From Swiss-Prot:
Quaternary structure note: Homodimer.
Gene3D superfamilies with a match to the protein in the record: Medium-chain alcohol dehydrogenases, catalytic domain, NAD(P)-binding Rossmann-like Domain
Protein name: Quinone oxidoreductase
One Gene Ontology cellular component annotation held by this UniProt entry: cytosol
Tagged with keyword tRNA-binding: no
CDD domains: QOR2 (cd05286)
Entry keyword set: NADP, Oxidoreductase
EC top class named in words: oxidoreductase
Recorded family membership: Belongs to the zinc-containing alcohol dehydrogenase family. Quinone oxidoreductase subfamily.
Pfam family, one: ADH_N
Native organism taxonomy: Bacteria, Pseudomonadati, Pseudomonadota, Gammaproteobacteria, Enterobacterales
GO terms, molecular function: mRNA 3'-UTR AU-rich region binding; NADPH binding; NADPH:quinone reductase activity; zinc ion binding
SUPFAM superfamilies, alphabetized: GroES-like, NAD(P)-binding Rossmann-fold domains
EC number: 1.6.5.5
Amino acid sequence: MATRIEFHKHGGPEVLQTVEFTPAEPAEHEIQVENKAIGINFIDTYIRSGLYPPPSLPAGLGTEAAGVVSKVGNGVEHIRVGDRVVYAQSTLGAYSSVHNVTADKAAILPDAISFEQAAASFLKGLTVFYLLRKTYEVKPDEPFLFHAAAGGVGLIACQWAKALGAKLIGTVGSAQKAQRALDAGAWQVINYREESIVERVKEITGGKKVRVVYDSVGKDTWEASLDCLQRRGLMVSFGNASGPVTGVNLGILNQKGSLYATRPSLQGYITTREELTEASNELFSLIASGVIKVDVAENQRYALKDARRAHEVLESRATQGSSLLIP
């Protein structure tokens, strides 16, 4: 028997349940992974709450984990039993001690990277890869705005931007988070609880503002993000932490300077095995060399059965960096 987290109705963290189950055999082109560390991501709360509803209920949760391959389905040639792997684009159900995953969605994990490092960074790192390298390729010495700079994605973005020589201006909600972002490589930070984001961006850039804004907050920062952009700048809306952006009048993009806006996703940028290999190789290289550090605080590691508590803390915005479930 194995253990997983399920929910039978949408709602708050209280809907999460721990259940025992018998894992199915891996189908063709699938592998079965004994998870050693499971990534917790904000998108998991959207699925649980019903903002991004699963196809049916009851449903599992989570798409990211790292572990050891225990079984291999027919047609899988590049992964073997015993391989250390990490994945971030599985079907729902990674909040589990055992999970079946499409083989092409898993990457072989280098020995230099632990299961905990991998599960804490893979989805977030792949996200930063497509944001900074594909959606808009930030350039050396180029200032840009990145919201939630002390979150799991944000801290990796701070480190990656520094490695690229770019100047990340990060928004944060406390002095402690400001220091965390600066330590990770942010060029400047803005405490949105105490400062005007727009006025500070203008001040930092000498009135020029920025070419690109990366916004995972959603409705609360939409207008401010647009006001931080230069003429013909790009608004990259990639999350809804404060709720989705709805009812947008496209005319506002004209009014604020012929702006561009995009709503990218990981699946839109990393779909094929070749795309996953390109992204994961770059991420693994940065982690293995110590350029990107993804150590998880002890108080943000939870037993699998404590997923409910992990979600409560995540949604309270009390976390810094990544959180993990340990089966």
